[in-house]
Amino acid sequence: MTDSTQTPDIPLLDAVQARLLGCLVEKEATTPDTYPLTVNAAQSAANQKTAREPVMNIDAGGVQHALRQLETLGLARQHFSSRADRYEHRLQAALDLTRQQTVLLAQLLLRGPQTLGELVTRSERLHRFADADEARHAIERLQQRALLVVLPRASGQREDRYMHLLCGEVDGAALAAKYASSGGGSEAADPGLAERVAQLEAAVAELQAQLAELRG
């Protein structure tokens, strides 16, 4: 992050654009050999059944349209090639973020509201935080820039949850209530085990994305 006092404008994304942007950040770290992503690989990443909330089913045309919109917003860049066009994210550069802030935003783009502990654990393949304080500091900086908000706690919740604001203002009370009514998601019983399973399933999804890449 630079020392410039001029704060970049914050773009307003729709749900598909947000999902694709999060995928580009994620795959830059987890599948560097096939990054930047083709439209097919980006579609596979966006429609993963694991490590995504909500699960989406975006067709190739919708993916390509969203990627082009991200490029117009300065959040992605297209690379032309003889075989297939590819896309890379520019989230960190466009919004003048640190690596830590970029990774945290990506997790929120991909999986919605999360606690500090969930963000630290789920970010390990993208950036290994030294401790919770490092992540907390990055969250505070994002909050100061109105890129992130702390959600009100619903009944029975013991930890704060955070949500990005790249899709505009959120109904914090409704999101908190939705999370509480779901029992905290599938991770509530054993978050460590659930996360390891999610990582294995994500690895399978990445292999599928690589196959899609080879097919064109």
Swiss-Prot record:
Superkingdom of origin organism: Bacteria
Pfam families: DUF480 (PF04337)
Alphabetical list of HAMAP family matching this protein: UPF0502 (MF_01584)
Family: Belongs to the UPF0502 family.
Name used for this protein in its record: UPF0502 protein Smal_0052
Source lineage: Bacteria, Pseudomonadati, Pseudomonadota, Gammaproteobacteria, Lysobacterales
